[in-house]
Regions:
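Bacterial Sec-dependent signal peptides at the C-terminal "C-region" and cleavage site
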Residues: 17-29
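Metal-centered catalytic cores of metalloenzymes
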Residues: 26-130, 134-268
Length: 268
């Protein structure tokens, strides 16, 4: 979210775990279902459990793309002082996508924020950020202000209006390195006197929309409610594919996992 305090040279922590550590999931990377079912990306160790991306299919089409967290993830999460450099407010884990993924989302930045982040009084609750990126990871990692003028110019280059989701605005042309410019919905509850429990954000960079981001408190996820919330979407998309019209938070009892998903996918 806007105004995170991040050291761009020490942000990413990707865990390549051996099979013996991947508790809660059975296989490294599941195959794409022929018609219906769920395909998973490679599990990554987070806390005492594992996290991985997934795509769910129905009738041969992708209907949901999300992140699955095994139950044990909520135990042993790193604290602010556990970061390798000791002064960051976020821990990021990069998730690959399932093989054959038909959505425009190329990887997920899964962020745990033990003390929340700015702005104070709004997003300072312990929460998770789920960045579904529409650019390759290598391109995102290159988004650093080595050339300040060029970096700022790309931040100020907004998408054309038809590519901007309905109801969303960029409060300021300020880009977070290796993330982008964050766009908010001013009608969201947290901007209207209510406590933050969940919200949805989009991100842009260099004239294009590059990510979709549910942000959800740890307490909300652990409440095991099933909540589907409509979101604004753009008239057009720069990449063809399946795009969300809502996002869903749920506890999957059968799989014993928490799920946060971009749902109601439609073709653009």
């Amino acid at each position: 979210m806007l105004l995170k305090t991040i050291n761009t040279l020490g942000l990413v922590a990707v865990v390549a775990a051996g099979a013996e550590l991947l508790t809660g999931f059975s296989s490294p990377k599941d195959l794409v279902p022929a018609t219906d079912g769920t395909a998973y990306g490679t599990p990554v160790v987070v806390g005492s459990g594992t996290v991985r991306s997934y795509v769910t299919y129905a009738g041969g089409e992708a209907v949901e793309v999300g992140v699955a967290m095994s139950e044990a993830v909520m135990q042993g999460l790193p604290a602010a002082g556990d970061h390798p450099e000791g002064h960051h407010d976020t821990h990021e884990f990069v998730l690959d996508m399932p093989d054959g993924n038909p959505t425009p989302f190329k990887h997920v930045g899964f962020n745990w924020n033990p003390g929340g982040h700015e702005p104070p009084g709004i997003y300072d609750q312990p929460h998770f950020d789920f960045h579904f990126y529409m650019i390759p990871e290598a391109d995102r990692m290159a988004m650093v202000p080595a050339d300040t003028a060029d970096f700022n110019a790309k931040a100020r280059s907004y998408p054309s209006p038809e590519f901007v989701p309905a109801g969303y605005v960029a409060p300021a042309p300020v880009a977070i390195p290796q993330m982008g410019v964050h766009w908010i919905d001013p009608k969201s509850p947290e901007f209207n006197g209510k406590a933050f429990t969940q919200t949805f954000i989009y991100g842009s960079w260099n004239g294009k929309l590059i990510f979709a981001e549910p942000m959800i408190t740890k307490a909300m996820i652990e409440s095991r409610q099933t909540v589907t919330t409509p979101i604004g979407s753009a008239e057009r998309a720069s990449l063809p594919g399946r795009y969300p019209t809502s996002y869903t938070i749920r506890w999957n009892e059968r799989a014993a996992q928490y799920e946060v998903a971009l749902s109601g996918l439609v073709t653009k």
